[in-house]
Regions:
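Short, conserved structural micro-motifs that define repeat-unit consensus positions
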Residues: 51-55, 88-91, 145
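Short, Lys/Arg-enriched, disordered terminal segments
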Residues: 1-6, 179, 184-188
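Acidic, glycine-centered active-site loop in nucleotide-sugar glycosyltransferases
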Residues: 162, 167-170
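Beta-rich strand-turn-strand
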Residues: 134-149, 154-158
Length: 188
């Protein structure tokens, strides 16, 4: 009941607060005001299942109450995070990201697709220290490995290995962030 109350309060009032990091010129200096950051963090941390410390929820960020997000992570403007999503520590999520954890059934051809219902939700996991760019679409069952970067506008339909850079539609890995020799010493 308590989480529901704070979730409703966040939805009703959180978007009215200023941006998380607002700089106002004052006698030749930029004054940093972050009341929106603290207000949304206060409400969201009480509305979701697991909220790490120093998490940032930008204006118009929406999420389910079952969200689990790690320390020092941030959700960008106009991003929607449904249920069954886990976000690790130190993750940067850009604006307008869309997560899909479920989808329509389309297996049968004898009845219309709109009457076939939904497939079971498949969880999405974003491991620690990831950067997800603007307008990325992440499809059901995907895991984005630790330290990975997903470029703006990518459609992620398959899991991304750790320390990778993925871009495009569909997203494909274009490079590794670390050398293979560093990977082998990391695992020992």
């Amino acid at each position: 009941m308590r989480r529901r109350f704070f979730s409703i309060l966040y939805r009703l009032t959180g978007h009215w607060m200023p941006d998380s990091y607002l700089y106002i010129p004052f006698f030749g200096r930029n004054i940093h005001i972050s009341i929106g950051l603290y207000y949304r963090r206060f409400l969201a941390s009480r509305a979701i299942k697991n909220c790490g410390k120093n998490v940032n929820f930008e204006r118009h960020a929406r999420f389910s109450r079952s969200l689990s997000i790690g320390d020092y992570s941030g959700i960008g403007k106009d991003t929607y995070v449904p249920s069954d999503v886990t976000i690790g520590k130190y993750c940067m999520l850009g604006p307008e990201i869309v997560f899909y954890t479920d989808n329509h059934n389309t297996d049968r051809t004898d009845i219309p697709m709109c009457q076939q219902g939904f497939k079971s939700p498949r969880p999405i996991v974003i491991e620690d220290d990831c950067w997800i760019g603007r307008r990325v679409i992440i499809l059901p069952g995907v895991t984005i490995g630790r330290g990975s970067i997903v470029g703006a506008g990518a459609v992620v339909s398959k899991s991304i290995p750790p320390y990778s850079v993925a871009v495009g539609n569909p997203a494909r890995v274009v490079k590794s962030r670390i050398s293979t020799s560093a990977l082998s010493t990391d695992s020992n």
